[in-house]
Amino acid sequence: MTGAVTVAVAEIGAFPGRGRAHPRVVEEVSRRIRQREGTPLAGSFVARCGGSVVIVAAHGPSDHPQVRLLLGDALEAGRAVGLNRGLDGCGDRTAASFATIEGTGANTGILVFVTDRAGPGIWTPLLCRLFADPFETPRLADDPVLREGFVFELTGSPTERFQTPGGILSLLAALRDGTGR
């Protein structure tokens, strides 16, 4: 059975100076989400990143409009707690950002990268090093399949496809196993 995962992030009540989401705000959002688990949510996780509240929710593939409303309502409830406490950053509901990933299975691993006050490009150099630099990830040179390298696809770039050098990985493998002394 395939499903979907929706991630929602919103700054709805933080202290001091929007540095950390208030625990009561996070608790209220979490409570509202837990009340609705099972219909239509299969599971969820609520956390904070800096002054923002983050919700990761698993659900059926066709449920995402309904799920977005549910998550928006939970964020609105958290925002109300923030307003009542006079917290910073009680943005409006429309400031929440949502992303839905379709086609996830029961055992699909999900990795969510969240930053506070940084664009999505903040992760690009780190992920590139992780998957392309054999000095960062030695297994790249050890495994014959991984040694072929990776193709990176960057949207919005004039050259959208980049092939990582498989040759350097073969050289390192030869140096490691003693055939290239």
Tell me what each language-model feature is.
Residues 1-181:
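Regulatory and interdomain segments flanking nucleotide-handling catalytic cores
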